[in-house]
Amino acid sequence: MPWIQLRINTNSDDAETISDLLMEEGSVSITFEDGKDTPIFEPKLGETPLWRDTVVVALFDAETDLTPTIAMLKTLPFLGENFSHKVEQIEDKDWVREWMDNFHPIQFGTRLWICPSWREIPDPTAVNVILDPGLAFGTGTHPTTALCLEWLDSLDLSDEEVIDFGCGSGILAVAALKLGAKNVTGIDIDYQAIDASRANAERNDVADKLALYLPEDQPADLKADVLVANILAGPLRELAPLIAERVKTGGKLALSGLLKEQAQEISDFYSQWFDMDAAAHKEDWSRLTGKRK
């Protein structure tokens, strides 16, 4: 069935209020969009950030008469009589199929492929990670994930113990295991990430080699030959002593989730524990690597 879409230009202070009112008016879904192409790279812990100029997009059943809703919105002091909005009719589509069509197998490095579960594997002889992008988090398309996957592909992980700090979907953990790691420990603050990592490990027949923990449950004596942390600059700095403690002497480290302008500061900070290499870059993002002193 077709839908009616109402787009309202507002700001971050009023977006949530408008969203609540539109839900009361019968909207079946609400999304927020960036009104002026303003990136938000690193929200604070627990924060759900919005852009200063935010577009509230509400979807209604096609039979809905929006005249009373728009009249109500005009009475709001922060919108006013002439508030900026647009009403559109949206034809129905097979949204799931359209979403699935956007995901294709991607190669990282020389050996590794990330393949959506519904796609044919391009090279059966390669190291193939079968991933369901609907489960959560990393799919390999983001530059930071790609940088980490390329780094893992470049290593000889045979019989190595690996830690994936901030494991998300488990894409890095599963890739490490498929590339020959002896075992991997995945750590994440999100229960959904733990579930997603477990599901993707099972899908790739490596679940028996993957241990998953919330931060408070990780073993106190945990150490690894290789540690990869694709999180953000703030947590990387805050967790640096713990991350350093988790890497064996001579072990390898990769850090990502960093903007180019953040890389040097984080590299300098980690240099008290690691011999750091030059940063690698992809688009606006960076990856740092080093060897434990």
From Swiss-Prot:
It is found in: Cytoplasm. Keywords: Cytoplasm, Methyltransferase, S-adenosyl-L-methionine, Transferase. Its EC number is 2.1.1.-. InterPro entries: Ribosomal_L11_MeTrfase_PrmA, Ribosomal_PrmA_MeTrfase, SAM-dependent_MTases_sf. It comes from the Bacteria. S-adenosyl-L-methionine binds at residues 145, 166, 188, 230. This is Ribosomal protein L11 methyltransferase. It comes from Shewanella baltica (strain OS223). The lineage of its organism: Bacteria, Pseudomonadati, Pseudomonadota, Gammaproteobacteria, Alteromonadales.
